[in-house]
């Protein structure tokens, strides 16, 4: 049967089915049972909380080791800032002409680039601006590929859930997670906090740190309906020039892999905090209010009367909340000097990048041929057992953290934490007691690049 005939047949069957079902549907009786919360118990080897930049990679890696792996994500998709937050521009994977972060994170980025028909920057050339070596990805594709890789690795994904209690009992963690109509008690041998806010670390009773003043978040959007080249900028206040220029550039088709602009527009959201549902709600409302006011103001400008929003992310991307107090705290001096520790498991390359209430950015760049590294001890909270973190909440001072928080670095941490957790199970010891050489060897087997 030809495809055309088959489609016609299916269409006719569908139409008949709908028509046949109408009379009974009109006379159907609605029997609605009272709402009941489904309670259950589950066991897993490695439980990862947070399906963002680091958690997604940690879950894929944990699953690929053969460990039973569960991933809790409070949202509807994986990827975190790369997808939901809209920073679809991960980096930095290369430094001084060489690749310094590879493994599963790089694999995922490459797959997203290839499937979207995009091109990579020329990493052999050292750019004048660090962000020119970041990689543009299609966020929708990235989210789908991340989910596919998790499922292929056997990961159980639990969307729309958040933990409500965390207890250590007889060498295992008991995590109560609640979601839409479900409450599950999960027993796990290893627990990895990838929330970005050190939420699980705090719930477990370990110390966390926070600055009195935190960096602003960003609500990412795009707009159209105007021609930047035709605008008379002399009639438009300077404070609007960046937003107008940025979105004009974004609409242009890139013909090479070279980044000539950051591929999104954004507004700063001071005090953005994703730690609780209440603070997260405030951050998102504030971001949308700021953007709405910007659009109203722009439409009053000459040549901008038809400006319109073409897309807006559903969440404000957050830069800074809580950090753990780990067995080792990475300092700014460690970072900018490119210090390598005996237990360094992954690299990090990005300038110290402290955003100050949207008014200025303090940056400090690494000197030629220096690359920072991340020791295992910075991923382990003090006095913890069978517990790791990955992502921006690692143990670090504020200035070091402003560089360590970026996506490629978080991906490397996620993979390192997952491999460490799997070895902990195999060896029957807590992560802090594992020989770093054993973790390094296993990471290399999975394609990661180890600091030396």
State the predicted function of each range.
Residues 167-184:
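Conserved beta-strand-loop-beta-strand element in the redox core of flavoprotein oxidoreductases
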Residues 2, 8-28:
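N-terminal export signals
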Residues 55:
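N-terminal Rossmann-fold NAD(P) dinucleotide-binding loop
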Residues 40-52:
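Beta1/beta-strand and adjacent pyrophosphate-binding region of the FAD-binding site
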Residues 61, 67-68, 74-165:
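Conserved N-terminal/central alpha/beta ligand/cofactor-binding core
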Residues 81-82, 143, 160, 179, ...:
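Flavin (FAD/FMN)-binding glycine-rich loop and adjacent Rossmann-like elements that form
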Residues 29-43:
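A short, basic/flexible loop-to-alpha-helix module at the beginning of a structural domain
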């Amino acid at each position: 049967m030809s495809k055309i005939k088959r489609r016609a047949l299916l269409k006719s069957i569908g139409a008949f089915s709908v028509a046949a079902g109408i009379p009974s549907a009109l006379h159907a009786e609605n029997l609605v049972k009272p709402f009941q919360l489904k309670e259950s118990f589950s066991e897993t080897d490695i439980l990862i909380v947070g399906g963002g930049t680091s958690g997604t990679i940690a879950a894929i890696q944990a699953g690929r080791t053969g460990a039973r792996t569960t991933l809790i994500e409070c949202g509807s998709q994986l990827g975190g800032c790369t997808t939901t937050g809209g920073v679809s521009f991960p980096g930095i994977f290369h430094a001084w002409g060489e690749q310094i972060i590879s493994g599963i994170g790089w694999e995922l980025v490459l797959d997203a680039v290839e499937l979207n028909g995009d091109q990579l920057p020329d990493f052999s050339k050292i750019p004048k601006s660090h962000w020119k070596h970041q990689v543009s990805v299609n966020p929708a594709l990235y989210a789908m590929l991340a989910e596919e890789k998790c499922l292929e690795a056997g990961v159980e994904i639990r969307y729309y859930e958040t933990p409500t209690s965390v207890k250590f009992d007889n060498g295992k963690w008991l995590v109560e997670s609640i979601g839409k109509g479900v409450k599950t008690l999960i027993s796990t041998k290893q627990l990895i906090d990838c929330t970005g806010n050190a939420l699980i670390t705090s719930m477990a009773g370990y110390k966390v740190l926070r600055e009195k003043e935190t960096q602003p978040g960003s609500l990412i959007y795009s707009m159209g309906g105007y021609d930047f080249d035709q605008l008379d900028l002399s009639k438009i206040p300077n404070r609007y020039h960046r937003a107008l220029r940025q979105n004009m550039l974004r609409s242009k088709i890139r013909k090479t892999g070279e980044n000539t602009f950051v591929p999104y527009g954004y507004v700063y959201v001071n005090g953005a905090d994703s730690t609780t549902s209440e603070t997260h709600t405030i951050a998102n409302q504030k971001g949308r209010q700021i953007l709405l006011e910007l659009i109203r103001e722009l439409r009053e400008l000459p040549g901008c009367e038809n400006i319109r929003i073409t897309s807006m992310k559903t969440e404000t991307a957050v830069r800074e909340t809580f950090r753990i107090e780990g067995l080792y705290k990475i300092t700014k001096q460690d970072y900018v000097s490119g210090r390598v520790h005996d237990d360094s498991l992954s690299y990090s390359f990005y300038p110290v990048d402290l955003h100050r209430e949207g008014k200025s950015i303090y940056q400090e760049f690494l000197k030629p041929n220096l690359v920072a590294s991340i020791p295992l001890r910075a991923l382990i909270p003090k006095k913890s057992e069978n517990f790791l973190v990955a992502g921006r909440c690692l143990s670090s001072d504020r200035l070091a953290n402003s560089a360590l928080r970026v996506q490629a670095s978080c991906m490397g941490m996620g993979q390192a934490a997952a491999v460490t957790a799997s070895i902990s199970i195999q060896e029957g010891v807590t992560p802090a007691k594992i020989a770093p050489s054993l973790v390094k060897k296993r990471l290399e087997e999975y394609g990661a690049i180890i600091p030396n």
